[in-house]
Amino acid sequence: MIIVSIVLSVSLLLTVSRKWKVIVGSMTVVLILLHVGLAINSSYKTKHVLSISPDLKHVLVIKENRETSVATHYRTYYGIFARPKESLPFKTNGNFKVKWLENDIAAVTYKAANNTIHQFIGTYGDRDEGYSYSYVGPSIHGEWKADKIKVISASEGITVYSNGIFERYDWDQVVQFGTIAVVLVGNNEAKWTIALNESFKSNSNESRPPSGEITIYKATMDKNEPIELQYISS
């Protein structure tokens, strides 16, 4: 009799166990399908732009809402978390081109909904050991040059000489990102990005000129490469 009771008890436990397995398994399948469905729906509504820095220390994250054409830059924390930091100022058309100018500077070139070209710069560092907020324009005061291109930063603004073409930008046409990059704007479009290389030092507290290099990068959706400039004179 005892043996029969034990057998019946074990059989009941196994039956309950099998039922719970079926229930749990069914719930798991439903949750997985729900998650996949939400992911597909979110993927359709949102375009993700992800790019990792050359030294693998920083991640550029931009999410574009396909319905509103609003793109938002996210700042990452601890490598896996991201929070919205700022929205790009122009509605976008879904096309983005990302180029890392330095390990801590990412240039995002994109076309707005009205077909104009713009640049957003993700910055993840500083120069001069980050003692205080600094402005890029004054810190690169002087003449910088490379083959077929020259940049002059003076009291009235920044001038770019490229392939025989002269372009002058007043300070209200210079948009700063962080403390290490600016975008030069003309006719309501981005024209150039100027970035401070990791080797750059302003030497602002000394009597000597800036040292190191800067980089200039043309705003275009076509394939192009940044150009490194050397300091020539003040």
What is each PLM-predicted segment?
Residues M1-T15:
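Membrane-embedded alpha-helical segments of integral membrane proteins
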Residues D104-A106, H141-E143, G157, G178-V183, ...:
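Short, hydrophobic/aromatic-rich segments at coil-to-beta transitions
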Residues A106-S134, G186-S234:
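Beta-sheet ligand-binding and adhesion/scaffold domains
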Residues V136-I152:
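Tryptophan-anchored aromatic micro-motifs
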